[in-house]
Regions:
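N-terminal accessory/capping or targeting/presequence segment of soluble
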Residues: 1-87
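Flexible, acidic/His-enriched mid-domain "rim/lid" segments that flank
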Residues: 77-161
Length: 161
């Protein structure tokens, strides 16, 4: 089974939201290695990530040196690059299928770090096509709500018994 590597947020990336169904608006690194989820994100998100994905390995940006990078006066995009590089090194991934929507500056940094990326729309789409139990439960809730909303109209159009 290939490893998968993502960078972005779950608000704008359907692929990342599929892997980790919790709203996170700031960019972070997510990997799937041998079927196990690895997440490197803001420490503020740790409890929400652990509640949503109890089996995931979660690392916070603080443990990767966030405050030291801030003290160095780096700009936000430079911090994103360095934390992402450190995240991938911490996870230990050397080769992965990546979402072609990964930002170029991040993909370039990963490649400069020696990571082999295989950009593959089909592989990412195939993962999203297989719905998780949480996604199926959401679909069922939406269908039940739609049926309940349509029921009065259906009864009124049916005519007298």
């Amino acid at each position: 089974m290939p490893s998968f590597l993502f960078f972005g947020d779950t608000e704008r990336s359907p692929a990342m939201r599929h892997e980790l169904p919790v709203g996170i608006g700031d960019p972070f690194v997510l990997a799937v290695i041998d079927g196990k989820l690895h997440v490197v994100a803001s420490d503020l998100e740790r409890s929400r990530i652990e509640a949503t994905a109890p089996g995931a390995t979660v690392h916070g940006f603080k443990e990767l040196g966030l405050f030291e990078l801030l003290d160095q006066g780096l700009r936000h995009h430079e911090i994103d690059l360095e934390l992402s590089s450190r995240a991938v090194a911490t996870i230990g991934i050397r080769e992965a299928v990546a979402d072609p929507e990964m930002p170029v500056f991040i993909a370039d940094r990963f490649r400069a770090d020696g990571i082999v990326l295989h950009l593959d729309h089909e592989a990412i789409a195939a993962r999203r096509r297989v719905k998780t139990e949480a996604e199926m439960a959401g679909i069922r809730r939406a269908q039940a709500a739609a049926e309940a909303a349509c029921a009065p109209r259906r009864r009124s159009c049916a005519g007298p018994p």
